[in-house]
């Protein structure tokens, strides 16, 4: 798979293009008198060094771009790479099956767990089918149905957050979008089973929170979590989406800032260049964090889980 480079990665893209060009020449004519292997090796080392330098000093807007990267792993990618025996469950038993939310039972190191997550699309048709990862009320009601099923069978719940926000269409509002989100917030705070939430890409406002109330909340290194998109904030404050980079910095949407505010528990490091550069390595790190979180939560009684979750929620807003 050829990498899709972002604007701030263009110096890296130029080096990678040179490497690809030299490699192609070498493959076309193996009888060339010149040995280009050393040059390719040198350029690859230079590319890694340059990537380290660029990624060591990323701003909030650049991280927001990475969180939206079209090649970034989605929920179903992590399900495939980190879990076994996934059986997808569909429908809210009231209206429809919202493809922007996926969920089902799987095994994590042999242990049954309930997985729920946002799912964006890659190709145009899939993006439309998944509504670009923006759930309607039936998606959140499906998520709640699966959470209640997990509680009934005493299975831990693992959620993956990756949405620009809940779908704001007229139909969604008519079917009770705000009520569906509010009900999920309430019911998740009352769950009697361990619940682990991880932001894997965009954590967009109430659309993210509706599956984001848990005993542990993690973020991938280059994910974001915010009440509004940087473009939306800029449009309100400065009447121009061009001010999005300024808004991103001011809003504190990145993982280190949110951990500093005690809104999340852990930051999961990403491979050099972002999760899309090495999905397998990213999935391994994510799996290790989930197993560690489950080990921490397994020793707690149901009452302790609920009390800790309540105290966590009540602490929000205090420095």
UniProtKB/Swiss-Prot annotation:
Residues 35-296 form the CoA carboxyltransferase C-terminal domain. Acetyl-CoA carboxylase is a heterohexamer composed of biotin carboxyl carrier protein (AccB), biotin carboxylase (AccC) and two subunits each of ACCase subunit alpha (AccA) and ACCase subunit beta (AccD). The keyword Electron transport does not apply. This is Acetyl-coenzyme A carboxylase carboxyl transferase subunit alpha. Its main location: cytoplasm. NCBIfam families: accA, AccA_sub, PRK05724.1. Belongs to the AccA family. Component of the acetyl coenzyme A carboxylase (ACC) complex. First, biotin carboxylase catalyzes the carboxylation of biotin on its carrier protein (BCCP) and then the CO(2) group is transferred by the carboxyltransferase to acetyl-CoA to form malonyl-CoA. It catalyses: N(6)-carboxybiotinyl-L-lysyl-[protein] + acetyl-CoA = N(6)-biotinyl-L-lysyl-[protein] + malonyl-CoA. Pathway: Lipid metabolism; malonyl-CoA biosynthesis; malonyl-CoA from acetyl-CoA: step 1/1. The keyword Endoplasmic reticulum does not apply. InterPro entries: Acetyl_CoA_COase_a_su, ClpP/crotonase-like_dom_sf, COA_CT_C. It comes from the Bacteria. It is found in: Cytoplasm. GO terms for biological process: fatty acid biosynthetic process; malonyl-CoA biosynthetic process. HAMAP family: AcetylCoA_CT_alpha. GO terms for molecular function: acetyl-CoA carboxylase activity; ATP binding; carboxyl- or carbamoyltransferase activity. Its EC number is 2.1.3.15. Keywords: ATP-binding, Cytoplasm, Fatty acid biosynthesis, Fatty acid metabolism, Lipid biosynthesis, Lipid metabolism, Nucleotide-binding, Transferase.
